[in-house]
Regions:
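A short-motif feature that recognizes glycine-rich, charge-decorated loops
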Residues: 1-163
């Protein structure tokens, strides 16, 4: 069955572009949780209470906000075999359409994995519900292994973005 699962590596599991993102909530493995909000110019800014902190680099918030846009799994396994206990971190992407895409980070056999699920609010449009259902249909049963660099992008600590 896992050979058939490998075909998922070639699919666009959660098709999100940077311009689709309204904001991101990040609960990293280390440090406090924080939020990033999209700017009118296409970038991202730290939300209160961290919005007054100086950034380590102008693009730092965008790098932390956009790992889902660069999703490139290197392996796949059944989610039930990887997602055991509490996740290491959580990265919630809020799209402008109203879809919440939740990427939970896991560590198994010295590899970084994520599981992906999507949800909407009760007031969601039919398009948002359709997009969330499509993501869940592709991603829900699976855990996706990532390179260390890609995996760490789903758990960027606040200290890596702002002083």
């Amino acid at each position: 069955p896992l050979q058939r699962a490998m075909r998922w590596l070639d699919l666009d599991i959660a098709p999100v572009k940077a311009g689709d993102i309204a904001g991101v909530d990040i609960r990293p493995a280390q440090g406090p949780s924080y939020r990033l909000d999209a700017n009118a110019d296409g970038g991202f800014s730290l939300a209160p209470p961290y919005d007054k902190r100086p950034l380590v680099a102008a693009l730092a918030p965008a790098v932390a906000a956009e790992p889902l846009t660069r999703l490139s799994p290197v392996d796949v396994a059944r989610a039930m075999d990887v997602a055991v206990g509490a996740p290491v971190a959580e990265h919630i992407t809020r799209t402008k359409l109203g879809v919440f895409i939740v990427a939970r980070s896991w560590r198994k056999d010295d590899r970084g994995w994520i599981t992906i699920s999507a949800a909407t609010t009760d007031a969601a449009t039919p398009d948002a519900v359709s997009q969330a259902n499509a993501i869940n249909a592709k991603a829900a049963p699976w855990a996706f292994a990532l390179t260390e660099l890609d995996w760490s992008g789903f758990s960027t600590p606040l200290a890596a973005i702002a002083d």
